[in-house]
Swiss-Prot record:
Pfam families: DXP_redisom_C, DXP_reductoisom, DXPR_C. 1-deoxy-D-xylulose 5-phosphate binds at K141, S167, E168, S192, H215, S228, N233, K234, E237. GO terms for biological process: isopentenyl diphosphate biosynthetic process, methylerythritol 4-phosphate pathway involved in terpenoid biosynthetic process. Its cofactor is Mg(2+); Mn(2+). Mn(2+) binds at D166, E168, E237. NADPH binds at T27, G28, S29, I30, A53, R54, N55, N140, E142, G221. This is 1-deoxy-D-xylulose 5-phosphate reductoisomerase. InterPro entries: DXP_reductoisomerase, DXP_reductoisomerase_C, DXP_reductoisomerase_N, DXPR_C, DXPR_C_sf, NAD(P)-bd_dom_sf. It is an enzyme of class 1 (oxidoreductase).
Length: 408
């Protein structure tokens, strides 16, 4: 039985033109793709806010093109640099840090918020948008991994709408349209398998960061590329599915599909399955969310099944890639474990990207963090942030490094 996380927009929302957008994470892969969609359909959208993190030069270029009234950066140093880079005579309001991002997510002039910041740093803004009744195009899966129950309650109270940008969850969302929620038997997420599909643990012992970043199908940022290589990305998506669709962890299956053509499937009680197919390009899902319930040309190459050739599927290798099962464990056990899982993973990925640990150390670090968790169960955003910070500090200390990352 599907119980979606939020209501859908009222019918008149379809005719809102232009849609007013706050793009949080505009300098990343998702944000850049979103602006390409906006560029292709300028009459449909008005960009009122753009937020990046450390890539101030790119944010300045975006701001010069779109001239939003609000910009967001990570810190005061970035804000000063941004002001110097903006065109003469253009003086938008600049918001700083997580609180600034959250303020941007609640701007009265922004009807739709694209939550595309990387990792736990996107939680505050997503939670704020949910409290204020926004239409949220959600790419930041960590928001639901960390605070799915809280965000569901906010949506129920405010009328906020969540539309999933993740290609897999967008596929599920589309496959559910027009069907009785009670007729759904299970959800099946597809995974590409990443750049190391078919490798043994012995093979993985010597892989480099550069190897892990070379995804065979998708153009993604560094953090999600590593998550794809470890299968943690799919683990987080399994947890996300439980919150988005109100299903149990055992009702969410995962199959490896190396071609990344079938984005996910829904199985119904009659034994049938409905799949969503398309070219592996995030603009399809982004355009679908930004214009829902309408459909526009996303600007991607058309899928030709004859040229695509064979579509194959296989079971994930949980021995070589244990992160998927670690995510399932964290969700089953609850008691703050998903927060610990995500924090430990973000630290481990950061250490790997800076060549301070090996690839196979990533799941080991996460497993140790889960084993050490004392059962603390956060009940609000402040509690989640406190557990996140404590976990990061512990993981860094055990790894022999200083804590330089966090939810900010």
């Amino acid at each position: 039985m599907i119980r979606y996380i939020s209501a859908m927009p009222s019918p008149e929302w379809e005719h809102e033109t232009p849609r007013t957008l706050a793009l949080l994470g505009s300098t990343g892969s998702i944000g850049t793709s979103a602006l390409r969609v906006v560029e292709a359909h300028p009459h449909r959208f008005k960009v009122v806010a753009l937020a990046g993190a450390r890539n101030v030069e790119k944010l300045a270029a975006q701001a010069a093109r779109w001239r939003p009234e609000h910009l967001g950066v990570l810190d005061a140093t970035g804000a000063a640099k941004l002001r110097d880079l903006l065109p003469a005579g253009y003086a938008p309001h600049i918001h700083i840090g997580p609180e600034g991002y959250a303020t941007m997510a609640t701007l009265p002039e922004a009807g739709t918020v694209l939550s595309a910041q990387v990792g736990a740093a996107g939680l505050r803004a997503t939670e704020a948008a949910a409290r204020h009744g926004k239409v949220i195009c959600l790419a930041n899966k960590e928001s639901l991994v960390l605070a799915g129950d809280i965000i569901r309650r906010h949506c129920a109270g405010s009328g906020a709408v969540i539309l999933p940008v993740d290609s897999e969850h967008n596929a599920i969302f589309q496959a559910l349209q027009g069907h009785d929620p009670a007729s759904v038997r299970r959800i099946i997420l597809t995974a590409s398998g990443g750049p190391f599909r078919g490798r043994s643990r012995d093979d993985l012992a010597a892989v480099s960061c550069r190897d892990a970043l070379a995804h065979p199908n998708w153009n993604m940022g560094a953090k999600i590329s590593i998550d794809s290589a470890t299968l943690m990305n799919k683990g987080l998506e399994v947890i996300e599915a439980c919150h988005l669709y109100g299903v149990g962890i055992d009702d969410v299956g995962v199959v490896v599909h190396p071609q990344s053509i079938v984005h996910s499937l829904v199985e119904y009680e009659d034994g049938s399955q409905i799949a969503h197919l398309g070219t592996p390009d995030m603009r399809i899902a982004i355009a679908y969310c930004l214009t829902w319930p309408g459909v526009v040309d996303a600007g991607v190459p058309r899928l030709d099944l004859v040229k695509a050739g064979s579509l194959t599927f296989e079971e994930p290798d949980l021995h070589s890639f244990p992160c998927l099962e670690l995510a399932r464990r964290a969700y089953r056990e609850g008691r703050g474990m998903p927060v610990v899982l995500n924090a430990a993973n973000e630290v481990a990925v950061s250490l790997f990207l800076s060549d301070r640990i090996r690839f196979l150390d990533i799941p080991d670090i996460i497993a140790r963090a889960l084993d050490m968790h004392d059962g603390t169960t956060p009940h609000d955003i402040e509690g989640i942030e406190a557990l996140d910070e404590a976990t990061r500090r512990t993981v860094y200390e055990r790894a022999g490094h200083s804590n330089t990352d966090g939810m900010a």
